[in-house]
Amino acid sequence: MSVKRFNPDINVGLNVEEVTKRYESNLVNFDPSSKTKSFKQIILENVFTLFNIINIILSIAIILVGSYKNLAFMIIIILNTLISIIQEYRSKKTLDKLKIISEAKVKVRREGVDNKLNLNEIVLDDIIILETGNQVVVDTVIKSGEAEVDESFITGESETIYKKTGDMILSGSFIVSGNVIGQVEHIGNDNYTSKIVNDTKYIKAVSSEIMNALNKIVSTISMLIVPIAILLFYRQLYLEDSNITNAVVNTVAALIGMIPEGLVLLTSTVLAVSVIKLSRRNVLVHDLYCIETLARVDVVCLDKTGTITEGCMEVVEEKKESNKNIGSIIAKICTALNEENPTAKALKEYYHSELLDEEIIKNISFSSKRKYSGIVTNKKTYVMGAPEFILKEKIDKYRNKIDKYTKEYRVICVCEADNAKLENVHVLGFVLLRDKIRPEAPATLNYFKEQGVTIKIISGDNPNTVLNIAKRAGMKEDIEMIDATTLKTDEDIMNAVERYTVFGRVTPEQKKEIVIALQNHGHTVAMTGDGVNDVLALKEADCSIAMSTGSDATKNVSQLVLLDSNFSSMPEIVKEGRRTINNIERSASLFLVKTVYASILALLFIFIKMPYPFIPIQLTLASVSTIGIPSFILSFEPNNERVTGKFLPNVLKKAVPPAITIVINILIIIIISSILKLTYTQTSTLSVLMTGYTSFILLFKVCQPFNMMRKCLFGSMFLLFVFGIVKLKTIFSFSSFTLPMIFTTILCIITSHYFYNLIEHILKKSLENAKKMQEEKRKTLLKQI
């Protein structure tokens, strides 16, 4: 549908009637990138998960039969949900505060009066006034004036662009110098930045080994749980001396044992603690699981601005070609023009000496066309800028010097001339500038190198400039660079990402393609960014990191936000991630033992004509002493080793031997119980005892190498378990020990060690053979290629 456009006088702007019509037609600007989840959305998404729904159904079953003491497992579910809600809400509040702080007001002219309006109050065809230093919030056509515009936020290119009457200034850019009056051309989704953001509306699944493993376990169990529940309940109900209460309690005991609710809580808790630690280092974490992803990262893609450099220039040296004080001349020019581009700021910071004592007649503003700026005084004309544009044919005299300087620096030529036409121009000297490297950048880059993490620098700037910056920041001398304009196809990008370290003149779309290509090569990729031009790549990356000084769109799509925009936080984030994930992986084996043996037992007891050997409250003792407390304490130990391998295979390798051993023990106990005519309470007591004992064998292995803390942990947990068996019999429904029970216990202890070691040995050999076969297959494929 075509929209009727207004053409207001730039000195008057829209009138009240025209503005009202725009509001009625909903032609009002809004920022689609700035919305965060509502509190209601956060609650609903965290409460109604498949994991929670399964446990709620089981708890309802327990409540219906009145066995309230067996509801202890729901405490874990509630805690886990609360942690997730609180963490996500904290992130939302911090983001909303950042938005309020960074939200710019816009000077809008209506009915001849200039007022500062919010972003969402601007309407189509409004007349807006843009001055030096302003951010452009909507696509605007210049109606009067001219300006130098910095579009690096949206394109990555640091060179300013000259804009004049009739030109379009894109939203997301900044006015570096000059003042213009413009008319709003696009609003809302039609703005350039909004179109980029809209390309990222799909939700990319979080690349988390732990989350994927937990989801895989829960989804598998959810498919099995209904048929198992029906069959097991039927079997338990029609046993001799059984009733509906016993059948429900026994069935729920089997089913909750299959669900690793403790592992979910441990993971959420430990990650939440990591989030709190990182917040003290000014790091905002959106997604708990991105800490794990960052711990697994082997490639980090950086933009030079805001990470390696501070986003500003610095004067390095002054090369005089005359006796004149060029500092006073530069200071005079900078004061007169009051430009805000990075070069002008660096010159003003360096040259704050006494100004040139001459009267200014005319200012010569910088433009990308003339490439210099200056002043005309009552005595001379003084200019500074690009040597080739000032000297023209006279440049040959200084060619060797300039070529030497430009290898490492941006060269500003300072000259005097007789008039503004630069007649009889004389070189007074050269000022050498360069991008200011962050003091912490070399140490940060060196840390990643030592940790085996590859760095890729992706920028919209000239590749030679970016390469020099990379080398100054301490990257190795033999790194290679490429101009991304030469990468025409996906195949070109696939080949380039493995060979080159520095990518220059990269478009926003190419940044995304580079990230995808690295992932296709099997890498786990982290991406840092601050501009709208980084949004597409940030959404594709396995772990996305934004600077707080960046756009709202960038901060909202990123999993981590560096609140002080300090890249030196990265090593600490990685260390925290590695400590957290390594320890969760180690502790997870304790939890998955229960999931494995409970799943096998649930299937077996569909066919075995005996009551399920546990009730929920009994499993609580074994779980707390061999899993809950030990895993929680072990998860906070220091551990900076790089995370390798797949989470689930790594964990199952440790969990399967004790789980199968527990199943064998329980089968032995059932057989002996049938022969010796032991009661159900005696059978369940023996089952809990041997389940706990076998779990302690695994805990012993997990605690190695022992230190004082681990010795105390293991000893105290063993005593707690024994105390529960002996002194808390009534609470946990245990029986006193008889001679047949003692005999059965001794037999099971012996068989536990035998079967544990046997299964561990078989599993180890099987994995080694599988690894060899995989390696041989890989070699065969390479030979064929």
Per-region residue spans from a language model:
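Cytosolic catalytic regions of P-type ion-transporting ATPases
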Residues: 3-4, 13-16, 103-212, 410, ...
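Actuator/coupling domain of P-type ATPases
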Residues: 7-35, 79-82, 86, 90-93, ...
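Transmembrane helix-loop-helix hairpins at the membrane interface
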Residues: 29-107, 347
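Helix-interface capping motifs at the ends of transmembrane segments in multi-pass membrane proteins
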Residues: 53-75, 223-260, 272-282, 598-616, ...
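Cytosolic catalytic headpieces and adjacent flexible linkers of membrane translocases
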Residues: 230, 234-237, 373-396, 402-517, ...
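Membrane-embedded transport module
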Residues: 232, 477-526, 541, 548-710, ...
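Cytosolic catalytic regions of ATP/NTP-dependent phosphoryl-transfer enzymes
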Residues: 296-427, 433, 446-447, 455-467, ...
